């Protein structure tokens, strides 16, 4: 009996011993970082106070990737949010007037605000991360609509303390659940939707859609409203705004959700985003149109696009190497994963580059752009590739799209190929610039998202 008790105690102590040993080695790694106090406090909490190994690993995941996430520096953003709050509370203003006023104040006082950013590791507190880890971990452990997730899925679909850069570090899980989660208190008990991921997700989506009184205005409206107080109150947002509300509201309710996007949007217009849930079957079900359509109802069966990226918390290693080595760094973002082949048929392409053009280039990185409906800037960069053995090489490109390859000549990006169509059979057909601008070529025939 004594030996049995001793063995039991040893088994009980194993998680504690594991966390303590990890904490000791991890803290030594951060010793030289001047901002290590909050990190050490977080690791200490999950090694001594709450020694659950998976929580410790979740904390490590957050810390290891935090350098890829940014917030506004300084307090000027709060002046902007205060102004936005006063606009949204003014019932005498129409959504158009609210939007136009916000655009005016952005251009006159806050247009340079996104340039002044700071890494989250210099701002975030251990208490805030503990709040997010504990909240999401409890949902993963107890909610029937989240229990299908593996631990690795949990790290990306539920855990992150933010969904996009510049999102306010506030208690959005509690705030948005209070706005859109009342249905969880009185669920409809039936034999079909009850406690399913899709059933709960559509309940949250429907409540958000009906309570926000959204008035879709798809023109520029100033800096995005990224605080949990303002997000549910905006009436003039665009599709990405409401897709963000969707993914945050779902995560607040314990529904596994992520945010996907394309750099070139509807019919070669602006970029767009949508949210995705992971169902009980492990299927990834898309929202198609922000909050206004049912989840999983089909995803644009007639469309195709150049690229689709998933907003992740983990830093994309390909993008990280690019940001370190490129002589010209395009602002792709460090935490975006290429998932184009989950939506479309794709091709890896190799484009021969003339020797005389190669001599003018100052970097091994090259770029691929897709056509957009903008006379001033008719091409939008969608990805980067590399120049190897005299060829510009690009991977995982969407088919039946009009492209052009570009390179860095020391001053900026310049075309290094003629425009070309990547056909369904992966055949590359070059077309002249005159043909691209000719009415004879219906370049919008192959609509993107």
Give the residues covered by each predicted segment.
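Bacterial Sec-dependent N-terminal signal peptides
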Residues: 1-29
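Short Pro-Gly-centered beta-turn/loop motif in secreted/extracellular proteins
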Residues: 388-413
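Structured interaction patches on ligand/partner-binding surfaces of diverse proteins
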Residues: 409-438
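Hydrophobic/aromatic-rich core segments of domains that either
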Residues: 31-33, 186-207, 216-229, 234-329
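A short, amphipathic beta-strand motif
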Residues: 347-357
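Short, ordered, surface-exposed loop/turn motifs in non-cytosolic proteins
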Residues: 356-376
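Secondary-structure boundary elements
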Residues: 28-37, 49-234, 269-270
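Short, acidic Ser/Thr/Gly-rich low-complexity loop/linker segments typical of extracellular
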Residues: 374-390
């Amino acid at each position: 009996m004594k030996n049995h008790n001793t063995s039991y105690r040893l088994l009980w102590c194993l998680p504690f011993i594991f966390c303590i040993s990890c904490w000791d080695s991890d803290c030594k790694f951060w010793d030289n970082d001047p901002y290590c106090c909050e990190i050490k406090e977080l690791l200490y909490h999950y090694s001594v106070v709450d020694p659950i190994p998976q929580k410790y690993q979740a904390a490590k995941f957050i810390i290891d990737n935090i350098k890829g996430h940014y917030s506004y520096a300084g307090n000027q953003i709060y002046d902007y949010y205060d102004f936005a709050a006063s606009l949204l509370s003014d019932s005498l203003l129409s959504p158009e007037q609210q939007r136009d006023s916000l655009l005016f104040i952005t251009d006159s006082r806050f247009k340079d605000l996104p340039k002044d950013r700071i890494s989250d590791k210099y701002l975030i507190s251990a208490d805030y991360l503990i709040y997010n880890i504990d909240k999401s971990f409890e949902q993963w452990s107890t909610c029937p609509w989240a229990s299908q997730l593996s631990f690795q899925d949990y790290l990306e679909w539920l855990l992150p303390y933010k969904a996009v850069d510049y999102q306010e570090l506030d208690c959005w899980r509690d705030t948005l659940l209070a706005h859109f989660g009342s249905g969880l208190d009185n669920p409809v008990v039936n034999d079909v939707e009850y406690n399913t991921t899709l059933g709960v997700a559509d309940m949250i989506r429907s409540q958000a859609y009906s309570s926000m009184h959204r008035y879709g205005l798809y023109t520029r409206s100033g800096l995005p409203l990224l605080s949990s107080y303002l997000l549910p109150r905006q009436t003039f947002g665009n599709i990405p705004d409401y897709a963000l509300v969707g993914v945050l509201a779902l995560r607040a309710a314990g529904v596994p959700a992520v945010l996907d996007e394309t750099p070139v949007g509807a019919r070669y217009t602006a970029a767009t985003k949508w949210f995705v849930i992971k169902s009980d079957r492990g299927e990834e079900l898309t929202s198609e149109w922000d909050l206004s359509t049912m989840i999983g109802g089909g995803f644009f069966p007639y469309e195709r696009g150049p690229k689709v990226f998933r907003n992740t918390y983990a830093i994309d290693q390909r993008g990280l190497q690019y940001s370190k080595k490129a002589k010209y760094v395009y602002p792709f973002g460090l935490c975006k994963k290429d998932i184009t082949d989950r939506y479309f048929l794709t091709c890896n392409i190799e484009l021969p580059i003339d020797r005389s053009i190669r001599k003018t280039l100052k970097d091994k990185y090259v770029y691929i752009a897709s056509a957009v409906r903008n006379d001033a800037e008719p091409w939008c960069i969608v990805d980067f590739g590399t120049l190897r053995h005299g060829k510009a090489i690009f991977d995982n490109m969407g088919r039946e799209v009009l492209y052009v390859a570009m390179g860095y000549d020391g001053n900026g990006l310049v075309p290094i190929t003629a425009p070309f169509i990547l056909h369904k059979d992966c055949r590359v057909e070059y077309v002249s610039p005159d043909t691209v601008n000719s009415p004879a070529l219906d370049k919008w025939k192959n609509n993107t998202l």
